[in-house]
């Protein structure tokens, strides 16, 4: 069982950790053993984390995309499932233009563009629900089977059950990742700036398409 925080278009290391829990057994019949994933649903919202931001590779280098949330009496005191996306601000067209500019030359961008943007354009009220829809989308496109459930109460690190691999607080934009991130893959601007690791999983998907899973599993 893997315990993770919700994240907006999460980084590659997030999916590499899930892929470690997902096994393929080859014999006369291919059988799938889904990853068991539990999302932290009882924590309070934390600013400057992957909960509402992701990192992409743009023409000028690595760029942060931040999803605005509604500030109601201090977001850090609100449970994560109560955080609302601020749809009153006209940020979505700008974010979509930024993604198009960064990835329109990627081999698989046009293949995934409309289906990915349709999730954003559905404008779910809650951040947690939007992130969950995006997570399921990326898992499906990468071919990772996962059974997802949610915490029903908050447990401090070190207090979880022995069979739970607790990665809360490990995957963070302000700290270098200590997790397996897979092997380098082709990126549009690598010739100019070099390979950039642990970007949003959409960077991997747009560049590697159906081969994305092979880049994070060995």
Features from the language model and the residues they span:
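Residues lining hydrophobic/aromatic ligand-binding pockets adjacent to catalytic sites
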Residues: 1-218
């Amino acid at each position: 069982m893997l315990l993770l925080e919700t994240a907006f278009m999460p980084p590659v290391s997030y999916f590499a950790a899930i892929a470690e829990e997902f096994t393929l057994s080859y014999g006369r019949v291919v059988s799938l053993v889904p990853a068991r994933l539990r999302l932290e649903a009882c924590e309070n919202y934390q600013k400057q984390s992957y909960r509402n931001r992701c990192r992409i590779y743009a023409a000028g280098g690595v760029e942060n995309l931040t999803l605005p949330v509604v500030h109601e009496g201090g977001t850090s005191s609100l449970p994560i499932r109560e955080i609302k996306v601020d749809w009153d601000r006209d940020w979505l067209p700008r974010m979509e233009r930024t993604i198009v500019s960064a990835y329109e030359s990627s081999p698989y961008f046009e293949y995934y563009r409309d289906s990915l943007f349709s999730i954003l354009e559905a404008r779910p009220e809650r951040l947690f629900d939007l992130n969950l829809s995006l997570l399921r989308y990326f898992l499906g496109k990468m071919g990772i089977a996962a059974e997802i459930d949610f915490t029903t109460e908050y447990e401090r690190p070190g207090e979880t059950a022995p069979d739970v691999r607790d990665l809360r607080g490990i995957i963070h934009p302000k700290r270098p990742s200590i997790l397996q991130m897979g092997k380098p893959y082709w990126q549009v601007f690598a010739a100019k700036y070099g390979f950039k690791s642990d970007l949003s999983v959409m960077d991997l998907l747009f560049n590697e398409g159906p081969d994305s899973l092979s880049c994070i599993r060995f």
